[in-house]
């Protein structure tokens, strides 16, 4: 499903070249739950951005769903992204829309029939345990509820791949456990999950395959 072949990424900051990833090769199979860990600045977010084609590698090849993202035509990028759910540390909910409207938004943009939207939104809210908060606004949600709403939005199109970038970074321990439980449920439903976190203990708690980045290099592949 995902393959990186000797991938490097270098950013230019004025005249200075800053390496973010260096010679990373890995494979993630369909149906895996993989934890990507490492300190802040290790390259986790850069790697995820390459996977949903928000950026391109400086060297090497990135393949997702069998497509080489470096040669993917512009018109095919949107189709790729529709097959990938993405969640960030900040829930990024639209403040003037209800939970239901936030989750439904992308389906409306795609012209999905109203009846199908209703079914898909409530299916997603049920998975994340937020059905009773469908008409609440973001300001009325706890941080954990807001992140669950963000997860519902990410899975409402039933993507085969979910990328989660530090989704528990702003949460307390109880809320963190809630989100990890939701991620397990999403994975159990057949979605491939890649979770990036700087919190190494989460990888141990999840007992899943763990990829460790250090200064842009893949230094461990365990589990």
Predicted regions and their residues:
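ABC ATPase NBD coupling module
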Residues: 15-18, 69-85, 114, 186-188
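Helix-to-loop junction immediately C-terminal to a conserved catalytic motif
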Residues: 52
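Conserved ABC transporter NBD signature motif
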Residues: 60-68
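Short coil-to-helix segment of the ABC ATPase nucleotide-binding domain corresponding to the Q-loop/switch region
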Residues: 97-105
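Conserved signature/switch motifs of ABC ATPase nucleotide-binding domains
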Residues: 136-139, 157, 189
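Conserved ABC ATPase signature
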Residues: 137-141, 145-147
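Catalytic Walker B motif of ABC-type/P-loop ATPase nucleotide-binding domains
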Residues: 162-165
């Amino acid at each position: 499903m995902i393959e990186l072949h000797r991938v490097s990424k270098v950013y230019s900051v004025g005249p200075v070249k800053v390496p973010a990833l260096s010679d990373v090769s890995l494979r993630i199979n369909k149906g895996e739950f993989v934890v990507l860990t490492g300190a802040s600045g290790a390259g986790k977010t850069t790697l995820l951005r390459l996977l949903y084609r928000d950026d391109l590698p400086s060297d090497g090849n990135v393949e997702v769903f069998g497509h080489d993202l470096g040669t993917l035509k512009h018109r095919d990028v949107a189709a790729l992204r529709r097959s990938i759910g993405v969640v960030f540390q900040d829930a990024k909910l639209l403040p003037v829309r209800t939970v239901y409207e936030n989750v439904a938004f992308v389906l409306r943009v795609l012209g999905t029939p109203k009846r199908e939207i209703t079914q898909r939104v409530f299916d997603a809210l049920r998975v994340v345990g937020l059905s009773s908060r469908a008409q609440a606004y973001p300001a009325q949600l706890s941080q954990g509820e807001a992140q669950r709403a963000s997860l519902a939005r990410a899975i409402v199109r039933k993507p085969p791949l979910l990328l989660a970038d530090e989704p528990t970074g702003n949460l307390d321990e109880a809320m963190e456990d809630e989100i990890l439980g939701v991620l397990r449920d999403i994975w159990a439903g057949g979605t491939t999950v890649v979770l990036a976190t700087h919190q190494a203990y989460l990888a141990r708690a999840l007992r899943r395959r763990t990829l460790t980045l250090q200064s842009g290099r893949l230094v461990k592949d365990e589990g």
